[in-house]
Curated annotation (Swiss-Prot):
It is a lipid-anchor; GPI-anchor. This is Early nodulin-like protein 6. It holds the Pfam family Cu_bind_like. Residues 1-23 form the signal peptide. It comes from the Eukaryota. InterPro entries: Cupredoxin (IPR008972), ENL_dom (IPR041846), Phytocyanin-like (IPR039391), Phytocyanin_dom (IPR003245). Confined to flowers. Keywords: Cell membrane, Disulfide bond, Glycoprotein, GPI-anchor, Lipoprotein, Membrane, Signal. One of its GO terms (cellular component) is side of membrane. It comes from Arabidopsis thaliana (Mouse-ear cress). May act as a carbohydrate transporter.
Amino acid sequence: MGGQKIVLLSIFVCFYVFSLVSCTEFEAGGENGWIIPQSSNQSDIFNQWASKNRFKVGDTIRFKYKKDSVLVVTEDEYKKCQTTKPELYSNHDDTVFKLDRPGLFYFISGVSGHCEQGQKMIIKVMEVESTPQSPPPSSSLPASAHKKNHAVRKTSRFLGAGLVTISILVITVFSLV
């Protein structure tokens, strides 16, 4: 009976380690990508998409676009849809931005008129949790977000996490023998 408790504890530790080191890559806008909203009633599609996802420190946002750009700006610049000194400017058709801190990130298109038409987005990154309240779920996304696999991709923050987990399991198994 004591051996079973050790195995269960080891499995819990393994899941906890993976939850700490895994991050998610999101495709901005989901299946639609980083595009100009097609009509005025879609002007908030990016913020609606962002509000349906849970972003953590270490996650990344991939912006895919053609003949466009993406800028990371301040809140004031976001509201005005203009900037002279963006934190990031990219027009390479495929831009990946790492969410490196908790808080708000403001994104706008750098093409004249696109931001005013709704090609802008606010992403809220969650505070880092110091201790888990319960075992981590299999995914931090709502079930509806799993419909399109190309919009969200799990990745690993570092390769060592797998080795740590395997080591814990091997040590546990050999300690029971």
